Swiss-Prot record:
SUPFAM superfamilies: C-terminal domain of ProRS, Class II aaRS ABD-related, Class II aaRS and biotin synthetases
Name of the protein in its database record: Proline--tRNA ligase
UniProt-listed HAMAP family: Pro_tRNA_synth_type3
One Gene Ontology cellular component: aminoacyl-tRNA synthetase multienzyme complex
Taxon lineage: Bacteria, Bacillati, Bacillota, Clostridia, Eubacteriales
Amino acid sequence: MAGDKKFVEDITPMDEDFAQWYTDIVKKAELADYSSIRGCMIIRPNGYAIWENIQKYVDTKLKEYGHENVSMPIFIPENLLQKEKDHVEGFAPEVAWVTHGGDDELAERLCVRPTSETLFCEHYAKIVQSYKDLPKLYNQWCSVVRWEKTTRPFLRTTEFLWQEGHTIHETKEEAESHSLKILNMYSRLCEDMLAMPVVMGKKTDKEKFAGADDTYTIESLMHDGKALQAGTSHYLGQNFSKAFAIQFSDRNGKLDYPHYTTWAVTTRLIGAIIMVHGDNSGLKLPPRIAPTQAVIIPVAQHKEGVLEKAKELKEKLAKVVRVKLDDSDKMPGWKYSEYEMKGIPLRIEIGPKDIEKNQAVLVRRDNREKTIVSLDEIEIKVQEMLDIIHNSMLEEAKKTRDEKTYVATNMEEFEDTIENKPGFIKAMWCGDRACEDKIREVTGATSRCMPFEQEVVSDTCVCCGKKAKNLVYWGRAY
């Protein structure tokens, strides 16, 4: 029938056009659709359910750490945004402004929040007086607006969803420790939930957050060899506290400024899932983040007892996994392709012969392997299989990343690698901003991070040949 056309036929092969392959999956897997507003997207139920699972993980961890959720206004008065000079200069090109309320021109322009440091600082200045009031550990789930010039669903949009944490602490040591604690949590989110390996490290001064003392990052590598910043955690020092006059009486009765951290992950993680795990058949969802972990497909469901057994199986499995039964009248072959394209980690087939033998067939999305299991053990076997799939996807992603991580010791090697073998490039750097700028100008690669796990691949800077200070991961990035 015409309605049974296989969607996978419409997915552009990634080797042919990676950008189109990505867009095809976003649309065909019904993750998002384009809005009539430039750069904005409609996140559809399949996409939003992934975000909800990310939210559950992060929100649970934050509450374990003592954070509280709040909600700040969407608008920021212009005078408030101007208070931290480096911060406003960093965001000025991306700010959207509200100038009118109805037909009346506003006395002061309102910025649609690109991030909320200024709002949190204004509030903290009102409620913090003593060291006994610290730390303040606040987080909010919201959308922000940044007027991007080049957009792509999930990866870079004018409006996007995120969580933004804002905390203030009594000491520098406590704040820095907290910033790294959050980064570690983000790393576990990526590896334990998204099956996505990351490199943890510190940004260079050029790449750090506007107004920060230090920015820490997790960087992931996509199928096409481009890097993606998957999450950041910033130590802002006392810069914002001083700009907004947030003061507290310390343990000696003297006035001091608290130390600030801020950190975020966004819906771009959904784009990362697509580009790390997807293939030419479509989306490939890691089981722990997948809204539907298993789909039951009855074979020859018109035959007596098949549909009843499938429903019984769903009821049994629903107690231990997120499961769906497709009892529509579409052909099994169409369903196989449909759910493969939508990335459901595990397919469970059951037909008359399976029922006779008290068994079902499990088919993995990640490698299409089939396993026959007894219906008496199916709850345990399905859970075990989902863990196996997660571990396999993580190992495969690590293998791909490692195969696409190269070493360069001079600019000739660097340029040749970036043009012919896209991926991470490990190269030494002298610490001079001029060399960092030159590398970007010549190759289009940016410094992704100075990894916490430092190694020496050369004694000299890849760009100027002077004595090296740090190993840096470089790459072209989203």
